[in-house]
Amino acid sequence: MADLAKIEEQLSSLTLMQAAELVKMLEEKWGVSAAAPVAVAAVGAAAPAAEAVAEKTEFEVVLTAAGDKKVEVIKVVKDITGLGLIEAKKLVDEAPKPIKSNVKKAEADEIKGKLEAAGAKVELK
């Protein structure tokens, strides 16, 4: 019985991708295909894994407020977006506004850091 509990614990810790890979491996080994009963049984174990897979990979950097150093924020927005000075100023004046969309987590964090260093308030969505 202890072995079954250990197996259950290991299966519960699988990500959705790992669970799908396991299903394919077992289908090949046993010469069967996953039917509805298998999918129903896997739903309980896959629920926590679905949350892990749903983790965002693309973010939107939103300028929520320019802060006290508006000129510095405008310069950073101009550099990040490639906009002209007038367009960057308009974007900053109209905060909250998205600065950049569909960026990876690392790039979004980098942009957020630059804007916050200039005195802006920023959110990642």
Curated annotation (Swiss-Prot):
One of its GO terms (cellular component) is cytoplasm. Signal peptide: none annotated. Keywords: Ribonucleoprotein, Ribosomal protein. One of its GO terms (biological process) is translation. Forms part of the ribosomal stalk which helps the ribosome interact with GTP-bound translation factors. Is thus essential for accurate translation. Belongs to the bacterial ribosomal protein bL12 family. PANTHER family: 39S RIBOSOMAL PROTEIN L12, LARGE RIBOSOMAL SUBUNIT PROTEIN BL12M. Homodimer. Part of the ribosomal stalk of the 50S ribosomal subunit. Forms a multimeric L10(L12)X complex, where L10 forms an elongated spine to which 2 to 4 L12 dimers bind in a sequential fashion. Binds GTP-bound translation factors. This is Large ribosomal subunit protein bL12. It comes from Rickettsia conorii (strain ATCC VR-613 / Malish 7). The gene is rplL.
